[in-house]
Regions:
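Active-site region of the double-stranded beta-helix
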Residues: 1-108, 116-156
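Helix-loop elements that line ligand-binding/catalytic pockets
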Residues: 149-175
Length: 175
């Protein structure tokens, strides 16, 4: 790990709320406020390094800079409000134009909404930040859950679709 870090790799400590009681309490309180699942990761990036290339997340993020400084860059957003299943793929989604950049210093916090393309590069010192992921439920999540509940209680919703239903020109009047 030390060798990779000295070569510029970022150390990621995932789901630390499962190991640190204070972070667990912090996450539980945020879950009450936002009615969302909340988790934390800690990122330690060596000086003048980048942990991830430009990307967007499928959930909202709060970033708290703890040590060092990090330059954040924001790009045009290619996917508006992506679902978790619409994970960023650099081959499918081109990176937009740079629209903003700023430096986070210890104690600074930034909100990064889901779908906002961004990257971050540490400056001339090691950077440590806590990322809090807010996995908010969408109307799509609620609708999928409602249809599933209907299917569990009503066999009609579990019937197979008629043969040829996906074909162009299929007559839906008899379906």
């Amino acid at each position: 790990v030390n060798q990779l870090f000295s070569e510029g790799a970022t150390i990621i400590m995932s789901n630390l709320q499962e190991r640190l009681p204070k972070l667990a309490m912090f996450c539980r309180e945020l879950e009450k406020v936002f009615s969302a699942r909340v988790q934390t990761n800690i990122y330690m990036t060596p000086a003048n390094s980048q942990g991830f290339k430009a990307h967007y997340d499928g959930h909202d993020v709060l970033v708290l800079q703890v040590e060092g400084t990090k330059e954040w860059r924001i790009y045009d957003t290619p996917v508006h409000l992506p679902l978790e299943e619409q994970a960023f793929n650099p081959h499918d989604v081109p990176i937009g134009e740079l629209t903003d950049s700023f430096v986070l210093e210890p104690g600074d916090m930034v909100y990064v909404p889901r779908g906002l393309t961004h990257d971050a590069v540490s400056t001339d010192q090691t950077s440590l930040h806590i990322t809090t992921g807010l996995m908010m439920r969408s109307w799509a999540d609620v609708m999928v859950e409602a249809v599933r509940k209907m299917a569990l209680s009503d066999a009609e919703f579990r019937e197979g679709l008629p043969p040829g239903f996906a074909n162009e020109g299929f007559d839906t009047s008899g379906a």
